[in-house]
A protein has these predicted regions:
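Acidic active-site catalytic centers that drive phospho-/nucleotidyl reactions
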Residues: 57, 166, 308, 391, ...
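A general structural motif
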Residues: 57, 116-117, 190-202, 262-266, ...
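Active-site diphosphate/adenylate-binding microenvironment
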Residues: 13-17, 21-26, 34, 39-43, ...
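Conserved structured core elements
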Residues: 224, 271, 326-329, 368, ...
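Phosphate/pyrophosphate-binding active-site segments
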Residues: 2-7, 142, 301-394, 518-526, ...
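N-terminal alpha/beta PP-like core and its mobile active-site loop of ThDP/TPP-dependent enzymes
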Residues: 2-341, 377, 381-384, 457, ...
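Active-site nucleophile and cofactor-binding loops and adjacent substrate-binding regions
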Residues: 31-33, 52-62, 77-84, 139-140, ...
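Thiamine diphosphate
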Residues: 119-120, 314-317, 323-325, 329-333, ...
Length: 566
């Protein structure tokens, strides 16, 4: 490696900050501690990077995730050694599951203390090995720029993901008068971006034969910023579109070709279309169990083309008749560049549209406050254009089902790991990244209590997110499963007492409202247009369930709770 002399000696922490700034990083989420004191001393007067002080390391990681998920930019977090690093594990695992580009600096004890059970030592490299795309432990100060440059490249290319850099305290404090050349030289890491041309032609050949094709759009469409190409392809060949949870927004919910989200809480039309399709083109989707139901019967009548940037995902769960490794945007561009093939889906479109229209969503005649109506009303008030963040649980599924999405990267949620507590910090990160966009958080009373300490950030950093709590006095999704599959034994899933969330909001200096009047609800919710941080608590019935529902292990057509128009 080439050595580059510096004009004056610099500490490792100086090199961290300067390298990040040179790579275009302008925001860091973090929490100080002993092992990262050299870093925090260096950032004290550093210009060009702002630091957002979280209130818990898990919160810092989810804030970085919200920042990254809503923009596609790299999210960066800094935590101290030992408990600081282990507190960050959930956020790292969440990012790995959902392919979120993160760079996480973990403090570490000085090199001489590593492996000797020093105070606040944890083997974070070993712990994070299965939940990172790659990880490093820096052993020499001069190597910091090279390692950071490589780490950013790895995190943001191919299938995005988290990279951890473990930084011993002495390495970050020591000065060096030279650095190793910060060039990316990774011959063993060469992600495939350009799909195979012959495989692209095979897709179109099969499409010309298909009578019942379906497009399955996953989160990879958003990550590749390929929504425009997806829509053009669907419209050219008149193919109905089903999305995964993370694929929401890649096609507008109002689009006539959109059938809804598929899977466990997917729409009737989407699940029936996947079951009856004779050709499925899956793009940027990993076929997780919440989408496929019983994999043995998933799309059982269909030839499957699977386009994914990660070759490890192809054939892992669902066998692909036409495997295509490559970037989703490039694949769609290549499909669109080929001569148009003849196909006729008129009868198929007529059938799936009929399926879509024959189902009624929920009983709007019920004389109670319904969560679906709350979400629909907020969709109206925000013109379907807000960045929508959710925590995890029933409210997450209702939000996926009933908010009128229009754009990619519009839904920020924890998909693969299903992390309760994700919502509040992720919404903060999304708003910091998108100060000119409306950011709405839907959260349950359970998830709210997991990371509510992050609300302290709202006034300090002027982050006007709108927190909409759907309060059913329970862990709603757990309770629903207990009622459905455990003979109604709601073991430890019902909150007999809850904190006064209104007083909690006041303690953090946040405007607060509580609504439970059905007659005035539509008007009451208009407060959401105010440009201030706020908590809107809406009491809903404990009996509400997320429907339809495919029981675990069942096939997607075996839905419970589907209601048809008379």
């Amino acid at each position: 490696m080439e050595k580059i002399s510096l004009e004056s000696p610099k500490t490792g922490s100086d090199l961290v900050l300067e390298t990040l700034r040179d790579l275009g990083i302008d925001t860091i989420f973090g929490y100080p501690g002993g092992a990262v004191l050299p870093f925090y001393d260096a950032i004290y007067n550093f210009k060009g990077i702002r630091h957002i002080l979280g209130r818990h390391e898990q919160g810092c990681l989810h804030e970085a995730e919200g920042y990254a998920k809503s923009t596609g930019k790299l999210g960066v977090a800094v935590v101290t050694s030992g408990p600081g690093a282990t507190n960050a594990i959930t956020g790292i695992a969440d990012a790995m599951s959902d392919s979120v580009p993160l760079l996480v600096f973990t403090g570490q004890v000085a090199r001489a203390g590593i492996g000797k059970d020093a105070f606040q030592e944890a083997d974070i490299v070993g712990i994070t090995m299965p939940i990172t795309k790659y990880n490093y432990q820096v052993r020499e100060t001069a190597d910091i720029p090279r390692i950071i440059t490589e780490a950013v490249h790895i995190a943001t290319t191919g299938r995005p993901g988290p990279v951890v850099i473990d930084l011993p305290k002495d390495v970050s404090a020591l000065e060096t008068d030279f650095i190793y050349s910060p060039e990316v030289n990774l011959p063993s890491y060469q992600p495939t971006l350009e799909p195979n041309d012959m495989q692209i032609k095979k897709i179109l050949k099969q499409l010309s034969k298909a009578k019942k094709p379906v497009l399955l759009a996953g989160g990879g469409i958003s990550y590749a910023e390929a929504a425009a190409e997806l829509n053009e392809f669907a419209e050219r060949y008149q193919i109905p579109v089903v999305t995964s949870l993370l694929g929401q927004g890649t096609i507008a919910t109002s689009h006539p070709l959109f059938l809804g989200m598929g899977g466990m809480h997917g729409s009737f039309a989407a699940n029936i279309a996947m079951t009856e399709a004779d050709f499925m083109i899956s793009i940027g989707c990993r076929f997780d169990d919440r989408l496929t139901g019983n994999p043995k019967t998933f799309a059982k009548n269909a030839k499957v083309a699977h386009i994914d940037i990660d070759p490890a995902e192809i054939g892992k769960i669902i066998s692909a008749d036409i495997p295509v490794v490559g970037d989703a945007k490039k694949a769609l561009q290549m499909l669109l560049a080929e001569p148009t093939v003849h196909n006729n889906t008129e009868k198929w479109i007529e059938k799936v549209t009929k399926d879509k229209n024959r189902v009624r969503s929920y009983d709007k005649k019920e004389r109670v406050v319904q969560p679906q109506a709350v979400i629909e009303r907020i969709g109206e008030l925000t013109n379907g254009d807000a960045i929508v963040v959710t925590d995890v649980g029933q409210h997450q599924m209702w939000t996926a089902q009933y908010y009128p999405y229009q754009n990619e990267r519009q839904l920020v949620t924890s998909g693969g790991l299903g992390t309760m507590g994700f919502g509040i910090p992720a919404a903060i990160g999304a708003k910091i990244a998108n100060p000119d966009k409306e950011v709405i958080l839907f959260v349950g009373d359970g998830g709210f209590q997991m990371t509510n300490q992050e609300l302290a950030i709202l006034n300090i950093y002027k982050v006007p997110i709108k927190v909409v709590m759907l309060n059913n006095h329970s862990l709603g999704m757990v309770r629903q499963w207990q009622e459905s599959f455990y003979e109604g034994r709601t073991s430890e899933s019902v909150f007999d007492t809850l904190p006064d969330f209104q007083l909690m909001a006041q303690a953090y200096g946040i405007k607060n409202y509580k609504f439970d009047n059905l007659e005035t609800l539509a008007q009451d919710l208009e407060v959401i247009t105010e440009d201030v941080p706020m908590l809107i608590e809406v009491d809903i019935s404990r009996k509400e369930q997320v429907l339809p529902m495919v029981p675990a292990g069942k096939s997607n057509h075996e839905m419970l709770g589907v209601k048809f128009h008379a």
